[in-house]
Amino acid sequence: MNWLEAFILGIIQGLTEFLPISSTGHLYLGRHLFRLDEAGLFLDTMLHIGTLLAVFIYYKKEFIYLIKNPFSKLMLLLIVGTIPAVVIGLLFKDFFEDISKTGITIGWEFLVSGFFLYMADKQKNGRKKMDDITYKDALIIGSFQAAAIFPAISRSGMTIVAALWRKLDRETAAYFSFLLSTPAIVGAIILQFVDVFQGKAESISSTSLIVGTLSAAFFGYIAVSWMIQYLKRHSLKVFAYYVWGLGILILMLQFTDVF
């Protein structure tokens, strides 16, 4: 893989990690387009590190607070919200990944993701701020995050949807969703590094790794800041229409040699 392909995949990862359209699903598509297959596993890991850097930079004040106050309510909310994804991920990760490596399943997953995004906008706007979030809210939002074990189900999309259903206001829904993404991204990095050290990934140039990581970090930061502002006043339906269109296109492409 050359550095330009890594740069493009970094853009895809950075933008789609925080827009509710599934980064993993888009990376699967990117692999097929570039014919990368498992050769891109190590790069995938570095791309996740890039998006993790984006979250750390954007939320630097919050993470400094968490380090200084490890037993704060915010820390406990993040722990509670992470539990469902940890349990589901450890028990069923390989199973769900194996059944989701075909264009048919990825296409249907995009369609399902679009349904949740569309339905979320039918809810009345909530008024809960960060201080109003309960542990029950965090657990329910985290349970929706666990659904993103399916590659084309958007993690940020599901958590934002759940947060809106739990009556968080729109800005807080995105804000908490992206904070909650941190342990999920860390977990994904750890699991991917295990696969890398087990020899499941081919070598890739250091230039491509650096370019891909920095690209993911830069565009990830842009996506986080833009999405929080966008959701204040705009609908999620545009993302629902996008993933519906993408899902239908992928299903139609089953009649070609793309998948």
Swiss-Prot record:
It is an enzyme of class 3 (hydrolase). It is found in: Cell membrane. It comes from the Bacteria. Its EC number is 3.6.1.27. GO terms for molecular function: undecaprenyl-diphosphatase activity. It catalyses: di-trans,octa-cis-undecaprenyl diphosphate + H2O = di-trans,octa-cis-undecaprenyl phosphate + phosphate + H(+). Pfam families: BacA. The chain crosses the membrane at residues 1-21, 39-59, 71-91, 99-119, 133-153, 174-194, 208-228, 239-259. Keywords: Antibiotic resistance, Cell membrane, Cell shape, Cell wall biogenesis/degradation, Hydrolase, Membrane, Peptidoglycan synthesis, Transmembrane, Transmembrane helix. It is a multi-pass membrane protein. GO terms for cellular component: plasma membrane. One of its GO terms (biological process) is regulation of cell shape. Catalyzes the dephosphorylation of undecaprenyl diphosphate (UPP). Confers resistance to bacitracin. Bacitracin is thought to be involved in the inhibition of peptidoglycan synthesis by sequestering undecaprenyl diphosphate, thereby reducing the pool of lipid carrier available. Belongs to the UppP family. This is Undecaprenyl-diphosphatase 3. The lineage of its organism: Bacteria, Bacillati, Bacillota, Bacilli, Bacillales. The gene is uppP3.
